[in-house]
A protein has these predicted regions:
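Post-Walker A alpha-helix
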Residues: 16-17
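ATP-dependent small-molecule kinase phosphotransfer cores
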Residues: 34-92, 99-102
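NTP-dependent small-molecule kinase module
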Residues: 133-134, 151-209
Length: 209
């Protein structure tokens, strides 16, 4: 299962994903490529694969990304190899921007798309300023982009409002657990159980409607 967590810059999606990974087994993080320089304690291959613009564009031209976009002047993308490799060990969670999420929906219609929202606009502004990573002009650009992205929230499968980190992380965990219990994702397990009852074949579970 592919789980896409997206939302405006500063909404807290990266922090939420880290907490969810600590609370759930069988969940791998898809590491994106980017041309932006590392920030603070970021490590190559952990938060991102940091590459030159030349290398990124060569990869894009070769069709090696399942999604990529220009975000605040830098290139970001998810390689098909990364998604494939991480998917072998279970479910994969992606931390990508709204443009990338739309691309994933087109290529993988079964993906679960979750939009993380700040409680109010003022809180988002406060978080961006509190990071002390960008100047006023960059923050203003991020906030303007956030206004546009928020208007698209209705296109996503789930919305998590990050007004309280603990509650929001539990909401995200609940979404993933619920998706894992869908009958189409339980078919293999159900078939095995049916065999123990002396039955075989596909489970006869009626579809709605």
């Amino acid at each position: 299962m592919i789980i896409v967590v997206t939302g405006p810059s500063g909404c807290g999606k990266s922090t939420l994903i880290r907490r969810v990974q600590n609370g759930l087994d069988g969940l791998s993080f898809s590491v994106s490529h980017t041309t932006r320089p590392p920030r603070g304690s970021e490590v190559q291959g952990r938060e991102y694969y940091f590459v030159s613009e030349n290398r990124f564009r060569r990869m894009a031209a070769a069709g090696r990304f399942v999604e990529w976009a220009v975000v605040h002047g830098h290139l970001y993308g998810t390689s098909a190899k990364e998604l494939r490799d991480k998917g072998r060990s279970g479910d994969v969670v992606m931390d990508i921007d709204v443009q990338g999420a739309r691309q994933i929906r087109r290529k993988f219609p079964e993906a679960v798309l979750i939009f993380v929202m700040p409680p109010v606009f003022g809180e988002l502004k406060k978080r961006l300023e509190g990071r002390k990573e960008d100047g006023p002009e960059v923050i203003a650009a991020r906030l303007e982009r956030a206004r546009e992205e928020i208007r698209d929230c209705g296109r996503f499968d789930y919305i998590v409002i990050n007004d309280d980190l603990e509650r929001a992380s539990q909401d995200l965990i609940s979404v993933i657990r619920g998706q894992r219990c869908r009958r189409d994702r339980q078919e293999t397990a159900v078939r095995s159980i049916l065999k123990s009852f002396g039955r075989s074949g596909r489970p006869s579970i009626r579809k709605k409607g």
